[in-house]
Curated annotation (Swiss-Prot):
The lineage of its organism: Eukaryota, Metazoa, Chordata, Craniata, Vertebrata. Residues 90-109 are annotated as: Disordered. This is Retrovirus-related Pol polyprotein. The gene is Pol. The keyword Nucleotidyltransferase applies. It comes from Mus musculus (Mouse). It is an enzyme of class 2 (transferase). Gene3D superfamilies: 2.30.30.850. Residues 90-101 have a biased composition (Low complexity).
Length: 120
């Protein structure tokens, strides 16, 4: 069998498999993807992946600075964190001290912003 015969056979198999696959994925496309519930300013706990003996599994709470549909940027951690690795922290009672405030400064470049930390 030549290369052309193999490619034609592969194309025939692809045609047979394509329609059932397209129908299966069409059902999933009808359901909207729901992003995580976290918003800027929320407080979250971050999962600690490697815990030592008697060490808590969650660290924080941290304040959410930026969000994407799948990840969060939190105060105090340089890397972005996937939304599956955080959970919401309970809100502190009224009248308790809060964390620092943050100010967003835009630049000429639409892909750059500057975050500055203010006094609590």
């Amino acid at each position: 069998p030549s290369l052309q015969a193999h490619l034609q056979a592969l194309q025939a198999v692809q045609r047979e498999v394509w329609k059932p696959l397209a129908a299966a994925y069409q059902d999933q496309q009808d359901q909207p993807v729901i992003p995580h519930p976290f918003r800027v300013g929320d407080t979250v706990w971050v999962r600690r992946h490697q815990t030592k003996n008697l060490e808590p599994r969650w660290k924080g709470p941290y304040t959410v600075l930026l969000t994407t549909p799948t990840a969060l940027k939190v105060d105090g951690i340089a890397a972005w964190i996937h939304a599956a690795h955080v959970k919401a922290a309970t809100t502190p009672p009224a009248g308790t001290a809060s964390g620092p405030t943050w100010k967003v400064q835009r630049s000429q470049n639409p892909l750059k912003i500057r975050l500055t930390r203010g006094a609590p």
